[in-house]
Amino acid sequence: MKINQILVSGMALALSVASLSSTAKMTTDEIAQLGVTLTPLGGEMAGNADGAIPAWEGGIESAADAGYPDFKSSGHHPDPYEGETPLFTITTQNMAQYADKLTVGHKAMLEIYPDFRMNVYPSHRSAAFPQRFYEATRIAAATATLNATGNGVDNAVKGLPFPAPKNGLEAIWNHRLHYRSDGITIRNIGQAPVLRNGDFTLVKIEDAGVPIYHQPNTTVDNVDNLVIKFKHKVLAPPRLAGTLLLVHDTLDQSREPRKAWIYNPGQRRVRRAPNVAFDNPAIASDGLITHDQYDMYNGSPERYHWKLVGKREIYVPYNAYRLHSDKLKYTDIIRPLHLDPEHLRYELHRVWVVEATLKEDTRHIYKRRTFYLDEDSWQIMHVDQYDNRNRLWRVSEAHVINYYEVPVLWSTVEAHYDLQSGRYIAFGLNNEEDFTVDFSATHLSESDFSVAALRRDGKR
């Protein structure tokens, strides 16, 4: 197998340049290539040289397109690729053969954990989004700019701001602002901090969000520096049940920090929660992830220097419908040291590589982070995180599916592995839940994401 070369997109001319001086709006000619030689979000339409990565042909655009026309939100999504078998399996014994298409994190997991393996399946570029998001992206691409600090995006709403990123900040903002829904979404999920021996206590969460940036009535003038308002309600275990978290996530957090409030059922009061950001430990996570690791990365980019390294072909979790299946129990999935590889699906895809290096005058438990972003969706698929001695510490994966009733590509499970302790945390589990996710929760309104509503919820 040939050593993988950095793949350079003709629209991203300064791949290694991280300075803000390299940012520029897309030209009319560049925008005209969206949907022609490039996907509507800026990925390469063509497949790769040997055909292992197919051309993008629109992805799965509906439940009918997936082969399940009667499917509705709130259920477990049937697998469009059921019956496929792995092309091959990567193990510690044969990993050298595939080294050019493995991340540092996956190499480490294969070396450290003798039972970890990667079943590699045929690649399907299933990512798809509503046409209105594609149209909004064409508009945003002509006007969007990073602000003076790079900590926010100006002159863009509803669409992806930078389909042809010129630097690392633009790429990471694409992830932060990529489409998840334009209606209120609610889901029931589980979070499992796993001990080294495989024991865990499941934390059940009701998670809801209103995507301000993507709503149909949002304009540049009324977006009010907001990306999303979201609320977590802990349902179990009993010692945590009733804990509520409300977050108003801002576009430019250096100008206006993220606003967060928490309701503690023991104290029966709402208080501000300024620590719900950056490297503070996430709620009920046993310290295994930081707040800015949810959705693989969230919040302000201000503590890092960002560098766009280029594009690579690597094996990433993709089309993880088996992991999402209601035929599995949580104990089928969660094993000592890592998720059961039997239920994981990896495919070869092109990704953007972004390096984040901690600024000298700031602090974070991760000195360096390497992000791998799917070219078809801008979802972060994998992250390698290094400690302050520059040693690989934690490895994160987003196991994604196309929620084809929308459609939207998003994680069904995030797995964050601590290689130094042998522990990990899985977030997003819903196999044993009767209700999974509803992308148009009409029984909720934006007023349900206010401090007053948080107080009311706490008293119920």
Where are these regions (language model features)?
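Bacterial N-terminal signal peptides that target proteins for export
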Residues: 1-9
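Hydrophobic helical h-region of N-terminal Sec-dependent signal peptides
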Residues: 9-17
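N-terminal charge/polar-biased segments
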Residues: 14, 24-25
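N-terminal signal peptide c-region/cleavage motif recognized by signal peptidases
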Residues: 19-22
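Gly/Pro-enriched, hydrophobic low-complexity segments
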Residues: 25-59, 103, 231-299, 336-442
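Solvent-exposed N-terminal domain segments of exported/luminal and surface proteins
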Residues: 28-258, 264
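Long, C-terminal catalytic modules of enzymes
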Residues: 432-460
